[in-house]
């Protein structure tokens, strides 16, 4: 039986720390099936700045922020040739079947999804959780530019602003296994990408 893919959200902030390329190299060498969710990073930040300047509505900002994730994906494609775009569950399956690693482009699946709020209460973290839910409850890893204690609860990371407000509800509804990985966790992340990793621990 084929191993179930994991969902890995690669935070856009990693591009500002020098950690992005090494992480993408680890993912490109993965011996497990992986679906990458790109963070919006500075592209999404610019949407927020522009909205503050000219006051367009949250629904438009939500779509533009998702397109910021698409822009970040384009950056990822230039850095690792084993990454390929996918904008649907079927597309993800097709890319995985070729032996490549799908990078999810969220707009098509998310713009009319009634489970996704069209505002700033959800970011790429919550969207990654929603994708994991729609994939049947895939294990979810969020790669961040800060370290988080392994024992930190979902309530604590939400209160601290480490994840978006919508993340908690999606994870709880879907019963997802999840973990946040910071700079100190890269060796552990590499081990998770081996063919038979240790049992998931959130």
Give the location of each predicted region.
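Nucleotide/pyrophosphate-binding catalytic subdomain
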Residues: 1-199
């Amino acid at each position: 039986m084929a191993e179930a893919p994991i969902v890995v959200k690669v935070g856009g902030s990693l591009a500002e720390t020098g950690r992005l390329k090494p992480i993408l190299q680890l993912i490109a060498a993965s011996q497990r099936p992986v679906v990458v969710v790109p963070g919006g990073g500075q592209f999404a930040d610019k949407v927020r700045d522009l909205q503050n300047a000219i006051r367009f509505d949250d629904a438009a900002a939500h779509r533009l922020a998702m397109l910021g994730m698409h822009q970040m994906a384009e950056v990822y494609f230039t850095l690792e040739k084993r990454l390929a775009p996918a904008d649907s569950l079927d597309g993800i399956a097709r890319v995985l079947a070729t032996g490549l690693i799908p990078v999810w482009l969220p707009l098509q699946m998310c713009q009319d999804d009634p489970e996704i709020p069209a505002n700033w209460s959800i970011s790429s973290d919550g969207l990654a959780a929603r994708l994991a839910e729609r994939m049947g409850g895939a294990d979810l890893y969020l790669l961040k530019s800060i370290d988080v204690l392994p024992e930190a609860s979902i309530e604590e990371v939400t209160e601290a602003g480490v994840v978006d407000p919508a993340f908690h509800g999606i994870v709880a509804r879907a019963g997802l296994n999840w973990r946040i990985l910071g700079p100190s966790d890269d060796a552990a992340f590499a081990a998770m990408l081996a063919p038979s990793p240790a049992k998931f621990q959130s």
